[in-house]
Regions:
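N-terminal leader/linker segments that precede catalytic domains of diphosphate-processing enzymes
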Residues: 1-244
Length: 244
C-alpha cells in the first residue's frame, strides 16, 4: 500500500494544471508599481514567496462570459500549443481565470457593473453577487510558463499584463491566500523573495510595459522544460505548435 500511495503521489505531481495570472501595474505614481502578494508559509507550493495574483483554471471559468473580448493577437498566442481537446473558448477562459483568482486573493474586481447571465456557476457567485461582469479586453499576454517536472505542483500558467485602472471596485475581503499584499516599484519588486520563474517573468513584464512594440514584434516568452534544458521560446503572432 505504501508503494502504491507513493506512486499515486508521484503521478499527482506530474499533472499539469492550467492557470491564469494578471500582472497589474499602477501608473498613477511617479514610478510605476506592480501588485504582489506573499503566500502563506503553510502553502505546499511556493510557501512564503511573493507572487503575482492568480491561480488554477476552474471548469466554471468556461461557463461565464466576459463583457468584452481579448485582442485577436493575444487570443492567437493563447491558442499556441494548446492541449488537443481545448477550443477557442478555453483561451478566453484563461483570462477569466485570472480575473476570478485576483478577486478571490485580493478582493479587487476587474469588471463593469452589470448582471452575469444565469445560472451563475458556483466559483463565480461571490463576484456576481457584487453586481459586476468580468472584463478582459485590456489584458495583454506577456508570458507563459510550465512548471518543470519534480515540483510539488505543476502549472501551465499564462501571464497577462494590465493597467491597474481596470480595477473598478475593492470589496475589502479576500480568501487569505496571501499574508500580505503590496504595490512595489520595479526595483522594489526585484528585492522581494521571488520564485525564480517569477523573477524572469517580472523582467518580461517590465519590457512589455516599457516597449510594447518590441514584444508585439518578437512574440510572447514561453518557458518550459525540454529534457535537461529549461527553454525560453518566443510565441510568434498566430503561431501554432505541439503541446510540450
Amino acid at each position: 500500500m505504501a508503494a502504491n500511495s507513493e506512486d499515486a503521489a508521484s503521478v499527482e505531481t506530474q499533472i499539469i494544471f492550467d492557470a491564469g495570472v494578471v500582472i497589474l501595474i499602477d501608473c498613477t505614481q511617479p514610478l510605476p508599481r506592480i501588485l504582489f502578494g506573499r503566500r502563506r508559509p503553510d502553502n505546499v507550493f511556493l510557501p512564503d514567496k511573493w507572487v503575482f495574483p492568480g491561480g488554477r483554471f476552474d471548469a466554471d471559468d468556461l461557463a461565464v462570459s466576459a463583457c468584452d473580448a481579448l485582442e485577436p493577437k493575444d487570443h492567437a498566442a493563447l491558442m499556441y500549443a494548446m492541449p488537443a481537446a481545448w477550443t477557442s473558448a478555453h483561451a478566453t477562459a484563461l483570462a477569466l481565470t485570472a480575473v476570478r483568482e485576483v478577486f478571490e486573493e485580493t478582493g479587487l474586481v476587474i469588471g463593469v457593473p452589470g448582471l452575469m447571465g444565469a445560472p451563475v456557476p458556483e466559483a463565480w457567485c461571490p463576484f456576481a453577487a457584487l453586481g459586476y461582469r468580468p472584463a478582459i479586453s485590456s489584458f495583454r499576454l506577456v508570458a507563459r510558463a510550465i512548471t518543470p517536472p519534480g515540483r510539488t505542483r505543476r502549472y501551465d500558467t499564462r501571464f497577462f499584463l494590465a493597467d491597474a485602472r481596470v480595477i473598478t471596485f475593492d470589496c475589502g475581503q479576500d480568501d487569505g491566500e496571501f499574508t500580505e499584499k503590496g504595490w512595489f516599484t520595479f526595483d522594489a519588486c526585484r528585492a522581494l523573495d521571488l520564485p525564480y520563474i517569477t523573477r524572469l517573468i517580472l523582467e518580461d513584464a517590465v519590457q512589455a510595459f516599457e516597449s510594447p512594440q518590441r514584444t508585439a514584434k518578437n512574440g510572447v516568452p514561453f518557458y518550459y522544460q525540454d529534457g535537461m534544458a529549461y527553454r525560453r521560446d518566443l510565441i510568434a503572432p498566430k503561431a501554432r505548435g505541439p503541446y510540450p
